[in-house]
From Swiss-Prot:
Ca(2+) binds at D104, D106, D108, S110, E115. The keyword Transmembrane does not apply. Like parvalbumins, SCPs seem to be more abundant in fast contracting muscles, but no functional relationship can be established from this distribution. Ca(2+) 1 binds at D16, N18, D20, N27. Keywords: Acetylation, Calcium, Metal-binding, Muscle protein, Repeat. One of its GO terms (molecular function) is calcium ion binding. It comes from the Eukaryota. InterPro entries: EF-hand-dom_pair, EF_Hand_1_Ca_BS, EF_hand_dom. The modification N-acetylthreonine is found at T1. The keyword Repeat applies. The sarcoplasmic calcium-binding proteins are abundant in the muscle of arthropods, mollusks, annelids, and protochordates. This is Sarcoplasmic calcium-binding protein. Residues 3-38, 55-90, 91-126, 127-160 form the EF-hand domain.
């Protein structure tokens, strides 16, 4: 659907970390380095996160490791997968479970505001006021954290839900 395609294009732009119009290994490197630097990860922890992020990019974004992917290719890949394969939802669930498991560096199964800001910054989204708005849309609890499952489910809905009448927290965040 046009609505879903519009959201996939937003997702593509969010992955184009260096904002050059193409997703390539440079985007992977920049996101991994920013993420480990922001979290001040060193040694084995840094290496582990970088390996896990590389695996995520290769499995769910490039499909062919080390390749470049245009917005058109990205949208076509998702569209083809969505149309032919009822396992699309399961694939996207695995996709977001994997990346948010990496992002949840302290493994407490929740995301606090700083983790959220760092994750967005690692993907080239430096506008902190927009990121704070996005976090607020997820309705943090009294400890100012959001369950990891809530964040993952919001992203899954963003890339799989065709119903434009439903509130889409991630789409709203990117458009704010």
């Amino acid at each position: 659907t046009d609505y879903l395609v519009s959201k996939w294009k937003i997702w593509y732009k969010s992955l184009d970390v260096n904002h050059d119009g193409i997703i390539s290994i440079e985007n992977v490197e920049e996101s991994r380095n920013k993420f480990t630097d922001l979290h001040k990860l060193v040694g084995d922890k840094s290496t582990g996160v970088k390996v896990d992020m590389q695996k995520w990019w290769d499995t769910y974004i490039f499909l062919t490791p080390g390749a470049e992917i245009s917005e058109t290719q990205f949208v076509e890949n998702l569209g083809n997968s969505f149309k032919k394969d009822k396992a699309f939802l399961a694939t996207m669930t695995a996709c977001f479970n994997m990346i948010f498991d990496v992002i949840d560096t302290d493994k407490d199964r929740s995301i606090d505001l700083n983790e959220f800001i760092y994750a967005f910054a690692a993907f080239g989204h430096e506008n902190e006021s927009v990121v704070r708005t996005a976090f607020a849309l997820l309705k943090p609890d009294d400890d100012n954290t959001v369950p990891l499952r809530t964040v993952v489910d919001a992203w899954i809905s963003f890339v799989t839900c065709e119903d434009a009448s439903k509130t889409d927290v991630i789409k709203s965040a990117f458009e704010s």
